[in-house]
Regions:
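Substrate-access "cap/lid" subdomains that shape
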Residues: 197, 204, 208, 233, ...
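Short, solvent-exposed loop/turn and secondary-structure capping segments
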Residues: 103-106, 123-129, 160-165, 229-231, ...
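Active-site loop/turn elements of alpha/beta-hydrolase fold enzymes
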Residues: 154, 161, 249, 445, ...
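Glycine-rich nucleophile elbow surrounding the catalytic serine of serine-hydrolase chemistry
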Residues: 220-230
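Active-site rim elements
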Residues: 77-81, 184-189, 252-258, 275, ...
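Non-catalytic accessory segments of hydrolases
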Residues: 2-189, 213, 481-487, 502-504, ...
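Alpha/beta-hydrolase fold nucleophile elbow
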Residues: 209-221
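Mobile gating loops/cap/lid regions near enzyme active sites that modulate substrate access
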Residues: 416-420, 424-563
Length: 563
């Protein structure tokens, strides 16, 4: 018989789990729940087979080998102590109200929120203290809007995103090739494919926890948000969730690469770093690369790649041709085509932070007047646009000006502009389907966190700053000021009520807040007075939008487009 502080649960498609009871919060937590296994490095994962006996789900499971995050927000409570295991880290954590588990008839299942972490497809896991959802779920109970939160792992860095002709040839020559589906023959997209398996696990098993398998809200930040965008527009990934909250990330921020170009260049660089001769046969290269220990492989990537990308694969995960068959598939074009979006997608809450770029500017080298021309070129590859960029964003006169202007350019290039583009696309989707079939809401995070500015002056509402507010995780809650804690609870209320699709009523309050009219350019705004108000959704001026539109058109017109 289970001890008083644990609880046993039998899944519909799996086995029996033993989780932990938190009676103070009235929740149960099941950690290290396996949803898939990896048969070997650089192969598609397979669903976890049912097991006999009781599986211990009281402790955090292993994670994919990775370095600590280099982003400021994650330094508030860095992940420490988790085991690395590239083959057995596809696990998830489930945070569930005890009341949902006691609902034996499962007659009134509750909404589910599945979290996909960010980290540039290079780091991140469900072990990050930032994503501990115990307080989030407790608050949902207090609001009488109980939800289940699921946090997932997926393969990152070269374990989840690596592509080359050698990987392709080795798979094609392998004994298992003929038994694999066309989809599972994809290379370079294992991280996205892992996510798909996790969402499928939720659909198949969450009813056992008292969750509604037909009311799943996916939410993610940065690469996690970009992942959700991929799932929305890739036909092979449709049907995974019903609603989505996209936080600071779209396909445009992390577009797919090509096997023969960017993928091959990264692969060759990795081999050179590991002293594997490029003159060897594909089979011998792969034999040597597979023999490299997971930590040695991680170390080899440390100075080589800061960001990973999915990879175009000629009709496996990514379509080979556009929907009308007239041209090669280009996801940057598909992302603006409302026909491409998942037909079961019912709503999206879309937003970003005001000062996204302050977290990234230091990664580009010195930000000073001497470096300004080269800094500008990294974001604006066409010299004929330099004058327009300086007219729109300003000409720096001091080193401080360079830091400020460059941070703004980074934020707009990577986040504000793409959020604007996708916001316009989803608004067209709402108009085409009707607001009763699809609804778009917008938010803007315009306030920072006092503790972050103490760590690094000038961060402001930097990339990822909303995460401590949304999760209110135990290791971070003590860092809040009183006003920040109040805002955290209000943001949790908005996120939770979105999962219930009851934001009209849930956001009504004595101060007269109402649901923003997105078609009129409105959004929920988390202000620097630590309140949620209605404000303008678009962060860009008309001149800034025109500048980025022109740059995007020039990129699409070049022969180097990602096809």
């Amino acid at each position: 018989m289970a001890a008083a502080h644990t609880i046993d649960l039998t899944l519909a498609h799996g086995g029996t789990l033993r989780g932990t009871l938190d009676r103070d919060r009235q929740i149960a937590v099941f950690r290290n729940v396996p949803f898939a296994t990896v048969p070997k490095r650089w192969r598609a994962a397979v669903k976890k087979a049912p097991w006999t006996g009781i599986l211990d789900a009281t402790k955090q499971g292993p994670i994919i080998p990775q370095d600590p995050s280099i982003m400021p927000v994650w330094k508030l409570a860095p992940e420490k102590g988790s085991d690395f295991d590239e083959l057995n880290a596809l696990n998830l954590n489930v945070f569930v109200p005890i009341s949902a588990l006691k609902n034996e008839t499962k007659a009134d299942p509750i909404p589910v929120m599945t979290w996909v972490h960010g980290g540039a497809f290079t780091w991140g896991s469900n072990a990050d203290p930032l994503y501990d959802a115990v307080n989030f779920v407790q608050h949902s109970i207090q609001l009488h809007l109980p939800v289940i939160v699921v946090t997932i792992n997926y393969r990152v860095n070269v374990f989840g995103f690596l592509a080359s002709k050698e990987l392709q040839e080795e798979l094609e020559e392998s004994p298992e090739h003929s038994s694999l589906s066309l989809y599972d023959r994809s290379i370079g997209n294992w991280g996205l494919m892992d996510q798909k398996l996790a969402f499928e696990w939720v659909r198949e098993n969450i009813a056992s926890f008292g969750g509604n398998a037909r009311n799943v809200t996916a939410f993610g930040e940065s690469a996690g948000s970009a992942s959700l965008h991929y799932h929305m527009v890739l036909p092979s990934h449709h049907g995974l969730f019903d609603h989505a909250i996209m936080q600071s990330g779209t396909i445009y921020a992390l577009p797919p690469e090509r096997v023969h170009k960017e993928g091959q260049a990264h692969f060759d660089t990795l081999l050179e770093h590991l002293n594997i001769p490029l003159s060897l046969t594909s089979r011998e290269k792969m034999r040597r690369l597979r023999s490299v220990d997971q930590l040695e492989l991680l170390n080899a990537t440390r100075s080589l790649f800061n960001v990973r990308h999915p990879c175009l694969d000629n009709g496996k995960v990514f379509p080979a041709l556009a929907a009308d068959g007239s041209r090669p598939y280009t996801i940057q074009v598909a992302a603006r085509d409302i026909i491409a979006y998942d037909p079961i997608l019912k709503s999206v809450l879309l937003g970003s932070t005001k000062d996204e770029g302050t977290a990234f500017s230091r990664f580009f080298g010195d930000c000073n007047l001497q470096a300004w021309p080269s800094l500008l070129r990294q974001l604006v590859p066409f010299a004929e646009l330099d004058a327009e960029a300086e007219r729109v964003y300003g000409v720096p006169k001091t080193d401080a000006d360079v830091e400020r202007i460059f941070s703004k350019l980074i934020g707009d290039a990577g986040f504000s502009y793409s959020t604007h583009v996708i916001g316009d696309t989803l608004l067209r989707l709402q108009s085409a389907r009707g607001a009763d079939q699809f609804k778009l809401l917008r938010y803007n995070m315009d306030v920072g966190m006092n503790k972050l500015d103490e760590m690094q002056l000038g961060l402001g509402a930097t990339h990822g700053v909303e995460l401590p507010f949304i999760f209110g995780a135990p290791k971070l809650r003590a860092l809040f000021t009183e006003k920040e804690l109040r805002l955290s609870k209000e943001m949790q209320r908005l996120w939770i009520s979105f999962a219930y699709q009851e934001y009209y009523e849930a956001m009504a309050s004595s101060d007269g807040i109402r649901v923003p009219q997105v078609e009129n350019g409105e959004a929920f705004v988390m202000t620097n007075t630590h309140e949620i108000k209605i404000g303008r959704s678009n962060r860009l001026t008309e001149a800034q939008r025109a500048f980025w539109n022109r740059l995007a058109q020039m990129q699409l017109a070049t022969a180097d487009i990602l096809v």
